[in-house]
Amino acid sequence: MVEVTIMLSLTLVLVMGAIDFLLLFYQWNAAAKAVQIGARIAAVSDPVATGLNGLSHAVVSASVPPGAAMPNFVVTCDGRTASCTCNNDRVCRGLKGFDKVAMNTIVFGRGSSSCSDAKSADTVGMCDIFPRITPANVVIVYAQTGLGYADRPGGPMPTISVSLQNLPFQFFFLRGLMGFRDLQIPASTVSTTAQDLASHAPSF
């Protein structure tokens, strides 16, 4: 009987552990796919950093004439703090703050303020792929990497990087059976080039 009890206990731990880790890998994969979707949406949506579209005009000066290469900048928008920071005050003086509506568009999808209510594939947001994602989990970086030019009518053409933060996985079975602690889902970052930083078609 002792042997049977030991074998049953070990089998239970192995089976329950396998279920937990399969769930972990599923959520990891879903989070990575959600980041890909977020980067694609960010490339064709209003920037989370308000005023970013005006930087190509704001940098024009005696030292940066129209048509010159855009000075480098990196703007980081953190959904947890609902703020954007820039590493180049001279270039980023036109930035005004953090646009919650723009962040919600990336997280929830166009025309939505919640998850799992996308009306079509064109309106899917990050949390439609992975419902645990909230704006507080998302970090978006806009970095000037050589494209575009000063005074460009369409604004700058930064490289956009989307990543997740503070997204723990809570073991269900192993937490109770063996005291496993929460595990941070591995970070995933996807970068793409901005195409048209506007959520609406231009009017002529």
Range-by-range predicted roles:
Residues 18, 22-25, 93, 177:
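A general structural-boundary detector
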Residues 1-23:
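N-terminal single-pass transmembrane signal-anchor helix
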